[in-house]
């Protein structure tokens, strides 16, 4: 659709010219943004039933560091924020619960910061959450995330191929349905970088269609798509 006779010709053009905006455009076209709130909800159940009780007991500084890596259009980090709000209730103000959300795609981050979603994105939410955490976005069938949930998420551009140099280590890293694009070697080195950026006792959650090689990963396998740093 961009005036090239074939995909190969397009790739050759990208390699020859190496203009960042061309690459950005390609990434935005290639990376899937099919996502919705509470996607793969068994992860969120585990997060609520197992991970949060553990963190609330052990994090004496009351800082929860959670990273949504490859956050696409924002449903995942906003879902995490809603769960934190539900779980902590009136204690929420006593904790720093800000979620770091990163993506390589500027378009995705723009959509995420804009935080406007349609009815189908919200269909998996528990009863009452829509009225509690969303407002009408002005047009019929469109909703926007409430300011308290929005302000709990920090969006940053980040390429997962780069060294991880954030100030904090993480208690939980969500990197779901992102590594399907990577070959084994790339995946292994990314998982090692994640491991080094995880607090002891912290968790890595990946997509349900993904798995890590139990022999080569430093994380301990807990259950499908759920790993822990011992």
Enumerate the language-model features and the residues they cover:
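Conserved class I S-adenosyl-L-methionine
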Residues: 61-79, 98-100
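Conserved beta-strand signature within the Rossmann-like core of class I S-adenosyl-L-methionine
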Residues: 200-208
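Conserved AdoMet
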Residues: 1-67
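A short glycine-rich, Lys/Arg-flanked "PGG" loop and its adjoining helix->strand segment in the class I
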Residues: 188-200
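Conserved SAM-binding loop of SAM-dependent methyltransferases across substrates and taxa
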Residues: 73-92
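Extended basic-aromatic, gly/pro-enriched interface segments that bind polyanionic ligands
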Residues: 69, 90-174, 178-186, 211-213
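Core SAM-dependent methyltransferase catalytic element
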Residues: 172, 213-230
């Amino acid at each position: 659709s961009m005036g090239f006779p074939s995909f190969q010709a397009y790739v050759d053009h990208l390699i020859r010219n190496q203009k960042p905006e061309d690459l950005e455009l390609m990434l935005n076209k290639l990376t899937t943004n099919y996502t919705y709130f509470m996607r793969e909800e068994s992860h969120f159940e585990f997060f609520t039933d197992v991970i949060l009780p553990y963190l609330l007991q052990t994090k004496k500084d009351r800082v929860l560091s959670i990273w949504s890596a490859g956050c696409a259009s924002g449903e995942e980090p906003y879902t995490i924020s809603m769960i934190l709000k539900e779980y902590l209730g009136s204690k929420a103000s006593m904790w720093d619960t800000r979620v770091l959300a990163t993506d390589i795609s500027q378009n995705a981050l723009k959509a995420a910061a804009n935080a406007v979603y349609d009815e189908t994105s919200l269909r998996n939410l528990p009863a009452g959450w829509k009225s509690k955490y969303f407002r009408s976005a002005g047009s019929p069938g469109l909703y926007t995330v409430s300011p308290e949930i929005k302000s709990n998420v920090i969006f940053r551009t980040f390429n997962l191929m780069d060294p991880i140099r954030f100030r904090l280590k993480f208690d939980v890293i969500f990197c779901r349905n992102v590594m399907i694009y990577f070959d084994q070697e790339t995946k292994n080195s990314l998982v090692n970088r994640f491991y080094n950026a995880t607090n002891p006792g912290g968790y890595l959650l990946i997509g349900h269609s993904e798995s890590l090689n139990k022999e080569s990963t430093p994380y301990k396998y807990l259950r499908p798509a759920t790993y822990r740093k011992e």
